[in-house]
Amino acid sequence: MKDSIKAKLQSLIERHEEVSALLSEAGIISDQNKFRDLSKEYSHLEPIVKAFKEYTQALEDKQAAYEMLNEKDAELVEMAKEELKLANEAIEKLESELQIFLLPRDPNDDANVFLEIRAGTGGDEASIFSGDLFKMYSKYAEQRGWKIEVISASEGEHGGYKEIISRIYGDGVYSQLKFESGAHRVQRVPATESQGRIHTSACTVAVMPEADEVEGIDINPADIKVDTFRASGAGGQHVNKTDSAIRITHIPTGVVVECQDQRSQHKNRAAAMSMLKSKLLQAEIDKQQKEQSDTRKSLVGSGDRSERIRTYNYPQGRVTDHRINLTLYKLDEVMEGSLDSIIQPLVLEHQADLLATMSDE
């Protein structure tokens, strides 16, 4: 392991001890925001400290095994060889883990997200598939203990959605869903197809981190135009009585957001403003990623909504992620929310991409 990496790890261990001490101070305990932030930092540092302690122990075991090789007892020498082999394997594994821990962390990984699903080419079938995708993400969210709420929805004529926007909140939502942005293609025989022909349709998915106050996304009130209108869709009689739905236009960028699912105009406005901040934050992230991709091509995480990232082939029971050439023949499980078999390989590919970049520097 490089000395620079060891020095970085040592500084993180010292920070872990410092944070541990701070968390027991009365002034910190009484300040909820500071206590929450420090608790998050402590949780992030804990596995690093654990892995580094195991790494240090493995180095000591290796040294002890080397010394045993000089023993005259043949049985002890064989034992030393076995221990040396195990120590080397542990060192290699832990060095790899520690390098990943030191990768630059996406500051938005802990953020909640806004999930937008829009029907693309394919007419009614695209709308139906957007509904299937929303169910898939809803089930995945449930499996991970996240919560999901619909912000706005435009239903398709034969089921599904022309567009549905939801908010997903919980632990590490963006870190797991950030690679879902892009075009999702489906190949299947629509229920309305009498000839049994396979149709190809597509939906676009956009995942945006919910903008926090600390992100510095400030919106000048003079830069927005707010319109109220009567909500439509689900909600019973209430929706026809008041102009509770909100549409906000950000004049400098032309970004438009709507919210009509909350019961009051005040709540709809708050939700719409939060979504607008997230869209502006995402625009900034997209700009940074474009600048980075000009210097190096990243296999994962470009977030380009026009990029076809995945195909769901129903006749073959196959799902293919085109960015990493991953093909799985368990489409039914994926559509029931078992997304980790796709998401985790994407995360690992992204980590490998970052490690390669670090090696080049």
From Swiss-Prot:
Residues 287-313 are annotated as: Disordered. GO terms for molecular function: translation release factor activity, codon specific. The modification N5-methylglutamine is found at residue 237. It is found in: Cytoplasm. GO terms for cellular component: cytoplasm. It comes from the Bacteria. Keywords: Cytoplasm, Methylation, Protein biosynthesis. Signal peptide: none annotated. Methylated by PrmC. Methylation increases the termination efficiency of RF1. Gene3D superfamilies: 3.30.160.20, 3.30.70.1660, 6.10.140.1950. Residues 287-297 have a biased composition (Basic and acidic residues). NCBIfam families: prfA, PRK00591.1. Belongs to the prokaryotic/mitochondrial release factor family. Peptide chain release factor 1 directs the termination of translation in response to the peptide chain termination codons UAG and UAA. This is Peptide chain release factor 1.
